[in-house]
Structures are given as C-alpha cells and as structure tokens.
Amino acid sequence: MPRVDVGEHSFQYMEEGESSPAILLLCSTGLDSKQWKGLLPHLGGRRVLCPHYLCYPGTDDWKGEGEIDSWMDYRASEALLLAEDGPVDIIGHSYGGFIGLRLAKEHPDRIRRMAFHEPIVWGCLQHTERDDLKNEF
C-alpha cells in the first residue's frame, strides 16, 4: 500500500480505482480500509483513498512524547485531500465523520459532497469558547 508522510510519521493508505472525482473514505476508530470492502464494488471504478490511522497496522506508532497527538490522523487525511487535482467526495463513519467535518470546515472548496454516519460531533466543539454549544452535548 502507498504511504503519506506527516511530520515524523508515515501513514499507510488504501488506494483503488481511477475515475474522478475521488472518494475519501474515513473509517471509524479501531478499523481500517477493510471497513469499506463491501462498498468498493459499488463505486464504479472511482478513485478511492482511505488512510490507516496512527498506530494501526501498516502505519507508524506514535513517536512523540506524552499523549498521542489526535490531530495526526486529521493531517494525514488532509494531505490526501489536498493532493487530489479537484474536489472529492467524503464518506466518514464515527471518528472518520469527525475528521471529515473538520476537513469540510477547513477546506470547503475541496469537498464536492459528503456523507457521514454517526460522526462524533462533540470533537468539533473542542476549540470553541461557546459554552452553550458544549452544554448541549
């Protein structure tokens, strides 16, 4: 499988198909691209990318000190998104939905369509000072 480097870390990712626009598949916690194997035959040969997150098989373990930087998975996904020639479709589940929402917020011009199942949206509130939003969750 190909790799994308982010800082000191190297992330493995699944890449299949050729036709545009590409689809970025973002899996849930504990799963890798195998989560989407049942979906692949239905994507009509579209170019599909799916990063394997930090500490998952084929991807580096955390090399920093202290707690794992949870934004590393986001940065690997962002690198794949920005490497594409045009806007992509994103499909994300749970943790992958959170990453996808953040990508859409930061790079709306790079997203053509998006679909998320059970995104962990509370993570989107991590850096807000709006207590009213945090209190809802």
Protein language model regions, located:
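Short, hydrophobic/aromatic-rich segments at coil-to-beta transitions
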Residues: M1-P2
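Active-site signature of alpha/beta-hydrolase-fold catalytic machinery across serine-
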Residues: G38, R102-E106
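Conserved acidic catalytic loop of the alpha/beta-hydrolase fold
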Residues: M72-V88
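Catalytic nucleophile-loop/oxyanion-hole region of alpha/beta-hydrolase
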Residues: K63-D73
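Flexible "cap/lid" loop of the alpha/beta hydrolase fold
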Residues: K105-E106, R110-F137
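Short beta-strand immediately N-terminal to the catalytic nucleophile in serine-hydrolase-like folds
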Residues: I90-G92, H117
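Conserved HGGG/HGGXW glycine-rich cap/lid loop of the alpha/beta-hydrolase fold
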Residues: V6-G64, G86
